[in-house]
Design a protein with these regions (language model features):
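N-terminal Lys/Arg-enriched interaction segments
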Residues: 1-119
Length: 119
């Protein structure tokens, strides 16, 4: 087993609850950084516009695209692991880690800002 495979199997992801977004966010960000996946969550990665463009990619570009997809799917999987069933349903249609993360930020960052203002 490679070192990266070993590292990913040891990651313990805490589950987001309705009241724990701020601490969950910090922990998930750290986990995603440690797996070199944070840039996929924040920036995404370049995707072909359609299938014909993808078919025209060079071998090197095709390999890079597949590596990017694999890493983005790994990031999405880690995010999904950190959600209970009801919260998971909010991001179930997300096709990228960036999309899932943005949905969660929209749902929960606003809630934590409102709580801060109320205090």
């Amino acid at each position: 087993m490679s070192a990266s495979a070993s590292n990913s199997s040891q990651v313990r992801v805490l589950v987001l609850s309705e009241n724990s977004y701020d601490s969950w966010y910090i922990r998930m960000r750290t986990i995603l950084h440690s797996q070199d996946l944070w840039t996929y969550v924040i920036d995404g990665y370049p995707k072909p516009v359609d299938a014909s463009v993808e078919l025209a990619l060079s071998n090197a570009d095709c390999v890079l695209l597949n590596e990017n997809r694999k890493k983005d799917n790994k990031a999405l999987g880690l995010i999904q692991q950190g959600l209970n069933e009801s919260i998971f349903m909010k991001i179930s249609s997300a096709t990228s880690s960036k999309m899932a993360w943005n949905i969660l930020e929209t749902c929960y960052q606003g809630v934590s800002k409102v709580k801060t203002v109320k205090l």
